[in-house]
Amino acid sequence: MTSTASHAFRYSTVDGEHRHELEIKRSRFITVLRRAETEEAARSLVAELRREFHDARHHCSAFVLGPDRMTQRSNDDGEPSGTAGAPMLEALLKGSAVDGEADLSDVAAVVVRYFGGILLGAGGLVRAYSESVSRALATAPLIWRERLRLMSVEAPHGSAGRLENDLRAFGISVVGTDDGPTATSLRLAIEDAERAGAAFQERLATLTGGGCVAVDLETSWVDVP
């Protein structure tokens, strides 16, 4: 299953691991959410929980990976088809950090079920697995992941300090400096979006009278608390 989301510059994810337990008609639903950036990491969580809860009847799972949520998987693990993994995945896809925007990714969810002796029916299972993940997400700590452009700007030694202060005053992150024989190289990080890049170039031209040029180095995803 794939997503048609547009190219992402920011998304939210779970900060570490989070657990939540729900009881429905004597069945225990233990939800474990964990940040996972690869399929291997997501499947490793399932394997770990099979060992930890080895006497449970079901270990159903779903995960969403990638800034654009391009990798989406789910597994019913013995529950009737479509009653566990799919509603879990749907709950993850509705996950968001703020403003109601569905942007949660790089997260794996496993719901461990201990059967309580009362059959829930297909509809009841769908609601139970969906609610288990939704409630876990409601209390899970989330963080932002932002894609930043790393850039380099060279300025003469005599004006580099002032330029650095001016850039910081504009809210531009200066992540490092390197002194060369005749100039200082400032390493900067800005939001990797077209409008942010254009605004930065305008500010740089204004601050330096067009005397400094920014050189793109690379892009990098970083955690933003």
Predicted regions located by residue number:
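Short, charged beta->alpha transition segments
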Residues: 85-100, 139
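Short glycine-/aliphatic-rich beta-strand segments at the starts of folded cytosolic domains
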Residues: 142-159, 186-188
